[in-house]
């Protein structure tokens, strides 16, 4: 499977990715392949026509799989209760994703997968694939607009510390295996009454 990305970050800190047009790619436009060490700033980018030859990915994609991460959800739920600060031993600084335009017709516009933790995502325009948060911790998502799609919370852990607030979504949330709704999921605007009723 092709893993090439327009911009690839791995085991790095405090990288700024600013004011780029990234498009026509087999996989992600921007990919962060570990949470170690974080502190990145991703802003002012226009990323589209991505994930053209693969699947299960996004225009922005990340995965954590840091030292704390375990594929068994029950193990992670217990771990999060007992050691809530462990996730910050690898993702030591918050990665900021702001003021970008994203479009992915074959996945998610923004896809935080497999333990991606310690992110602040705000003021982004997502034009097609919505935004996915799976199996991570300490992600704040606010003031984003999701056109033609919505918020995809997948397999959230107990005590995730996740926040999803002040966003505009145009279709109902699409949760998968969500028992816990994080620290805050509130004050979001739904275009339809159905979306609000299902939230």
Task: Tell what function each PLM region has.
Residues 1-5, 26-35, 51-58, 72, ...:
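Short glycine/acidic-rich loop motifs that flank beta-strands on beta-rich extracellular proteins
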Residues 11-15, 21, 34-36, 51, ...:
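Short, flexible loop/turn elements at secondary-structure junctions
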Residues 94, 115-132, 138-149, 163-166, ...:
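Active-site core of glycosidic bond-cleaving carbohydrate-active enzymes
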């Amino acid at each position: 499977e092709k893993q090439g990305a327009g911009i690839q970050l791995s085991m790095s800190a405090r990288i700024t990715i600013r004011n780029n047009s990234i498009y026509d790619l087999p996989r992600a436009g921007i990919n962060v392949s570990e949470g170690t060490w974080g502190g990145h700033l991703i802003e002012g980018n226009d990323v589209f026509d991505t994930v053209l030859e693969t699947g299960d990915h996004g225009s922005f994609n990340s995965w954590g799989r840091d030292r704390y991460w375990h594929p068994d959800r029950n193990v992670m739920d217990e771990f999060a209760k007992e050691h809530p600060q462990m996730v910050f031993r690898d993702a030591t600084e918050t990665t900021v994703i702001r003021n970008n335009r994203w479009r992915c017709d074959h996945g998610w516009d923004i896809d935080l997968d497999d333990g991606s933790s310690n992110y602040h995502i705000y003021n982004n325009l997502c034009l097609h694939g919505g935004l996915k948060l799976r199996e991570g911790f300490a992600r704040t998502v606010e003031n984003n607009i999701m056109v033609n799609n919505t918020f995809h919370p997948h397999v959230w852990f107990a005590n995730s510390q996740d926040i999803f607030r002040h966003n505009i979504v145009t279709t109902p949330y699409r949760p998968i295996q969500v028992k816990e709704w994080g620290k805050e999921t509130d004050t979001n605007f739904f275009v339809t009454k159905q979306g609000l009723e299902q939230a």
